[in-house]
């Protein structure tokens, strides 16, 4: 079983690539939450587990993270890109 981790910083439009953003600026959203990310992960078709007490190593504030379970058929980058697209759709 492959378990991928998605931090809100991966999708945050206010961060640069060197600060941790992993998607294109056009796909990023402003201040994504773990709840939005978890909902998007479920929309993509994977199981999501929210861990609110975790923080990304490049950030000082604790924003949590989302564990993506049973993602054996996709790479981490594919999952992050799909989740970013869905978070953008959820915001509209």
Swiss-Prot record:
User: Per the annotation, which location comes first and is thus the protein's main one?
Assistant: cytoplasm
- Known InterPro entries for this protein? Signal_recog_particle_SRP19, SRP19, SRP19-like_sf, SRP19_arc-type
One CC-aspect GO term: signal recognition particle
Pfam families (UniProt xref): SRP19 (PF01922)
Q: Name one GO biological process term.
A: SRP-dependent cotranslational protein targeting to membrane, signal sequence recognition
Keyword field = Cytoplasm, Ribonucleoprotein, RNA-binding, Signal recognition particle
Q: Which GO terms describe its molecular function?
A: 7S RNA binding
Compartment annotation: Cytoplasm
Q: What happens when the gene is disrupted?
A: No effect on cell growth, membrane protein insertion, protein secretion, or ribosome levels.
Source organism, top-level taxon: Archaea
The similarity comment for this entry is:
Belongs to the SRP19 family.
Q: Say what the protein does.
A: Involved in targeting and insertion of nascent membrane proteins into the cytoplasmic membrane. Binds directly to 7S RNA and mediates binding of the 54 kDa subunit of the SRP.
- UniProt subunit comment: Part of the signal recognition particle protein translocation system, which is composed of SRP and FtsY. Archaeal SRP consists of a 7S RNA molecule of 300 nucleotides and two protein subunits: SRP54 and SRP19.
Q: What is this protein called?
A: Signal recognition particle 19 kDa protein
